[in-house]
């Protein structure tokens, strides 16, 4: 019994979130999207806002990510991408840098990521070319791109 309790505590400690894990609710949300400068059409700038219960799409499609106006999407679409937060690299929260690589410098596009923690915004622009960014971002880049594809299908 003592061994089982010790094992249970050890598992809980190693799998539980530390203070850097992000949580989503109405105030804490994740904004994600991509942008391509040398591009024409609706898909050049796509930005979304994910909360714990809903997914929203930006209507403005502002390349800079400064002007955002969101409308709610259907619950089925939310369900397809609601786990994106699980792939968010916690290390990103402690980064001093806000730009990784050279997003869209060679027409390869970039990702716009923003996290709101009780109104405190942190934003990043990330190069789509994974050779130009830290390896801990690679899986998240892939997941963001996959989420955008799922939303638009």
Predicted region positions:
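Sec-dependent signal peptide recognition
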Residues: 2-8
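Non-transmembrane, membrane-adjacent beta-strand/coil modules in membrane-associated proteins
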Residues: 46, 86, 97-101
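N-terminal hydrophobic targeting signals that begin at the initiator methionine
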Residues: 1-2, 18
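C-terminal motif of bacterial Sec signal peptides marking the signal peptidase cleavage site
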Residues: 14-16
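Post-signal-peptide N-terminal segment of Sec-exported extracytoplasmic proteins
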Residues: 36-68
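A short-motif feature that recognizes glycine-rich, charge-decorated loops
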Residues: 58-93
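Short, well-ordered, aromatic-rich surface patches in folded extracellular/luminal domains
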Residues: 20-40, 69-76, 94-153
């Amino acid at each position: 019994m003592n061994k089982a309790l010790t094992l249970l505590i050890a598992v809980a400690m190693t799998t539980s979130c530390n203070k850097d894990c992000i949580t989503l609710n109405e105030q804490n949300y994740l904004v994600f999207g991509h942008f391509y400068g040398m591009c024409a059409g609706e898909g050049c700038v796509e930005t979304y806002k994910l909360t714990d219960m809903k997914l929203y799409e930006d209507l403005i499609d502002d390349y800079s990510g400064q002007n955002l106006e969101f409308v709610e999407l259907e619950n089925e679409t939310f369900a397809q991408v609601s786990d994106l937060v699980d792939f968010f690299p916690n290390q990103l929260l402690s980064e001093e840098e806000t730009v990784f690589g050279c997003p869209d410098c060679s027409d390869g596009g970039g990702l716009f990521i923003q996290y709101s923690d009780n109104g405190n915004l942190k934003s990043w622009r990330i190069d789509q070319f994974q050779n130009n960014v830290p390896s801990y971002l690679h899986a998240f880049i892939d997941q963001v791109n996959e989420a955008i594809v799922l939303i638009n299908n």
